Structures are given as structure tokens and as C-alpha cells.
Amino acid sequence: MKKKDYYEVLGVSKTASEQEIRQAYRKLAKQYHPDLNKSPDAHDKMVEINEAADVLLDKDKRKQYDQFGHRAFDNSSGFSSNFTDFEDLFSNMGSSGFSSFTNIFSDFFGSNKSDYQRSTKGQSVSIDIYLTFKELLFGVDKIIELDLLTNCSACFGSGAESNSDINICNNCHGTGEVLVQKNMGFFQFQQSAKCNVCNGAGKIIKNKCKNCKGKGKYLERKKIEVNIPKGIRPNQQIKLSQKGHASTNNGVNGDLIIDIYLKESKVFEIINNNDILMTYNISYLDSILGNEIIIKTLDGDIKYKLPKSINSNEAIIINNKGLYKSINKDKRGDLIIKVNIVVPKNLTKKEKELIEQIYEQTSFNPENNINQ
């Protein structure tokens, strides 16, 4: 069966950034994860999504894929017959699960637990948090709510009504695996496969837990407090270990990955990594007279003595009032204020008379040279 294009699988363009690919993967993973999606094709779809993300989120693999397509990772072209010994033969059978001839027996018989029974880490969860400029600057504590797979409190994740309802699978004798015979050319060998009776669990549940209907887990709405420290930047991540979905076979929970984004602002902008640029309106009279004004900033009100005759688009620099240069440290960038001189559209009769008197007495004339 012909494989789908990895970019099509994730629904992104071939020029998509790593962030766009990561966001597309998270969206699809939430939609098709078998623990959340019970449709019969969810498992195969999730395998396809994981395979595509594994390649496209790895710079080297993506480069190979863009150049050669699926052929770059095609291991199905057969096996060479020019082996020097049996160890060479089995070391090349990457698809059989054996790393070399010397550990065939340990793969068959040396483990008390199959891959299907081993504890596995729970699925990690990714969420996006959008911060205001003030929250980004000073840090903030957020309470987030999300649905997480949690081990059943009644059966503690076993899925059984009681311990006596858990029986060893007679087909695989509790290993979760059975041996199947494979033919490859002139060679015949055995390979372990997941037991189709117990689905790799190694056990059969007689009476299922009524609380979780035998699943061992259920979705539970949880509130989680997230501390976002000062000094964090947009597009950075915070990882809360073991705050994700519950694990399988008593493994550790997955992680909660928080992607930080900045809400759009009409006032503030980040420049030079650590500086904050803001536009501030100033009265035309304050600019002419060089008055002391109150500038409202994210740090609060700041008194500032204007230089006389400051013009629009000139910058006022207030040191150490920008972003924190690193997480939970006190060194900061600068606040750069771009001045915008505001002239009133409506004047009182008295104001207009006074300005006309000044106009009649002034010799000021701004230069305009159209030949420059």
C-alpha cells in the first residue's frame, strides 16, 4: 500500500516551520489518540501521524525525506545473501526485532515481561497559553483546566472488579506474547508477536470494573496551577513533569507541555530581545515647553522631564525597565518610548487667540527642501 505524503498526513505545507508542524501534530494527536478516539481506524491513523511527525520534526530526517521521499527510510528492499556468518544475517534483520545473533535467545526467552506488559510513560499533553505584556514581564500564576486520563480510583487501573477477577491468559501463559513462524527465502525463524487473545496484557478480566467499565482509566477534569516565571519569552515552553495522562502498567504519568505565546498589543512591542518599545502620546504644549510629564508604564507611573521642543518619533530611553534578560533574574533591558506629539483638533476661542498672537510674533519657519 502506497504511503501518504508526510506533509499531507499532518496537513501542512512543505515550507511549514517547525512550530507549525508541532501545532498540527498536537491537534491531530488530540483528535485521533486511541485513548480519546474509539473509532476502529484511530490506532492506524495515530501510527501514521506519529511516523510523519517523527520525520518532519527531525531536521536531518526531513532533509532526507524532502530529497528522496519515502525511499530515504525504506527498509523493505530485502536482505542480501552475502552474509559472512549467522551473526551478520540476524544483525541485518532490523525488522525482526533482533539486534544480533548473540541475543536471539534473550529476545525469545530472556525477559519475564513482554514489550506489551512493560510500564510505559503516559501520553504527554500540550497546551497553549497566551500572556499579556504585563504577565510576560513580571510572570504570573495561571490555573488551567483540562481533561486528563486518570487511573480509576476503584480498581487502581487494573480494569477488574476485584483481584480475583484477573486470570492469567491461557494462550500466552501470562507473557503477553506468542511465537509465530516466519519464512524468508530459504530461512525460517520464529518471532514474538502480541497475543491476540489478551491483546498483550497477559491477563483476562472476568468481571470488569463498573466504575471505568474495564478500561482502567477515565477522563477527569483537572485544575492545574502553572507558575510562569518572569523572564520567559514568547515561543518558549514550560514542562510540568508527570502532569499529563496516566501511564500503562504502573508507569509514570506523561508530562504537561505549555507553549507560551504573547497576545497582540497595540502599545507594546519587543525589540532587541530584551527591550520594550512603546508609543506614547504627548501634548504639543508639553513638547514645546519641555514640561515634566507622567508616563504610564507596565512598572507604574514614571515622572520624566522632557527636553524642550522634542519632536514626534524621537525616542525617550528609560534604562532597566524592559524585559528581564533571563528567568528569575533581576537584570533588565530598556524601555524605549517613541514620542507622538498630539495637536488638539478643537480649540477654545481663547486658545486660538493666544496661538494667533504667538504666530504673529514668531520667526520660526520649518525648512522644506524639495531638491534634496
Swiss-Prot record:
GO terms for biological process, alphabetical: chaperone cofactor-dependent protein refolding; DNA replication; protein refolding; response to heat
PROSITE patterns: DNAJ_2, ZF_CR
One annotated GO molecular function: heat shock protein binding
The J domain, residue ranges: 5-69
Domain of life: Bacteria
Pfam families: DnaJ (PF00226), DnaJ_C (PF01556), DnaJ_CXXCXGXG (PF00684)
Cofactor(s) required, per the database record: Zn(2+)
Compartments, as annotated in UniProt: Cytoplasm
Cofactor mode of binding and number, as noted: Binds 2 Zn(2+) ions per monomer.
ZnF (CR-type) ranges: 139-221
Residues in CXXCXGXG motif repeats: 152-159, 169-176, 195-202, 209-216
SUPFAM superfamilies reported for this sequence: Chaperone J-domain (SSF46565), DnaJ/Hsp40 cysteine-rich domain (SSF57938), HSP40/DnaJ peptide-binding domain (SSF49493)
Keywords: Chaperone, Cytoplasm, DNA replication, Metal-binding, Repeat, Stress response, Zinc, Zinc-finger
Cited InterPro entries: DnaJ, DnaJ_C, DnaJ_domain, HSP40/DnaJ_pept-bd, HSP_DnaJ_Cys-rich_dom, HSP_DnaJ_Cys-rich_dom_sf, J_dom_sf
Gene Ontology terms: cellular component: cytoplasm
Binding of Zn(2+) 2, residues: C169, C172, C195, C198
Binding site for Zn(2+) 1: C152, C155, C209, C212
Note on domains (UniProt): The J domain is necessary and sufficient to stimulate DnaK ATPase activity. Zinc center 1 plays an important role in the autonomous, DnaK-independent chaperone activity of DnaJ. Zinc center 2 is essential for interaction with DnaK and for DnaJ activity.
Subunit note: Homodimer.
Annotated PANTHER family: CHAPERONE PROTEIN DNAJ, DNAJ HOMOLOG 1, MITOCHONDRIAL-RELATED
Function in brief: Participates actively in the response to hyperosmotic and heat shock by preventing the aggregation of stress-denatured proteins and by disaggregating proteins, also in an autonomous, DnaK-independent fashion. Unfolded proteins bind initially to DnaJ; upon interaction with the DnaJ-bound protein, DnaK hydrolyzes its bound ATP, resulting in the formation of a stable complex. GrpE releases ADP from DnaK; ATP binding to DnaK triggers the release of the substrate protein, thus completing the reaction cycle.
Entry's family note: Belongs to the DnaJ family.
Protein name: Chaperone protein DnaJ
Encoding gene per record: dnaJ
